[in-house]
């Protein structure tokens, strides 16, 4: 096969790819839409009259968290507090405090190993 024949084949293959490019159905795979969406990611932008276009492929990040206020429809209907025995005990007695001075030698494996004794 000569170079000329190879070039003809490669150009004809690229032409046929552009002419007969099948349209992929959007989001046909079940599962996470971020990983199963068949649309071109460059076209996946959303915008409203009050906002600039945003990429919808990666919808949430830490800066968007809490952007919208909670809607009353999703509030719990009733509040049932749980027992707070542990919190009440800590509130009454305080956290444990160890105010003693540690004078015991540290006997970890690193310090007991002869090769590491003088590396600190």
Swiss-Prot record:
Q: Which UniProt keywords apply?
A: Cell projection, Cilium, Cytoplasm, Cytoskeleton, Flagellum
Q: In which tissues is it expressed?
A: Expressed in trachea multiciliated cells.
Listed GO biological process terms: axoneme assembly; cilium movement; determination of left/right symmetry; flagellated sperm motility
Q: Annotated region Disordered: where?
A: 1-25
Regions of compositional bias (Basic and acidic residues) in chain numbering: 1-10
Q: Where in the cell is it found?
A: Cytoplasm, Cytoskeleton, Cilium axoneme; Cytoplasm, Cytoskeleton, Flagellum axoneme
Q: Which InterPro entries match?
A: PIRC1/2
Q: Which GO terms describe its cellular component?
A: axonemal A tubule inner sheath; axonemal microtubule; sperm flagellum
Q: Which family does it belong to?
A: Belongs to the PIERCE2 family.
What does the UniProt function comment say about this protein?
Microtubule inner protein involved in the attachment of outer dynein arms (ODAs) to dynein-decorated doublet microtubules (DMTs) in cilia axoneme, which is required for motile cilia beating.
Q: How does it assemble?
A: Microtubule inner protein component of sperm flagellar doublet microtubules. Interacts with CFAP53, ODAD1 and ODAD3; the interactions link the outer dynein arms docking complex (ODA-DC) to the internal microtubule inner proteins (MIP) in cilium axoneme.
Protein's UniProt name: Piercer of microtubule wall 2 protein
Q: Which organism is it from?
A: Bos taurus
Q: What is the lineage of its organism?
A: Eukaryota, Metazoa, Chordata, Craniata, Vertebrata
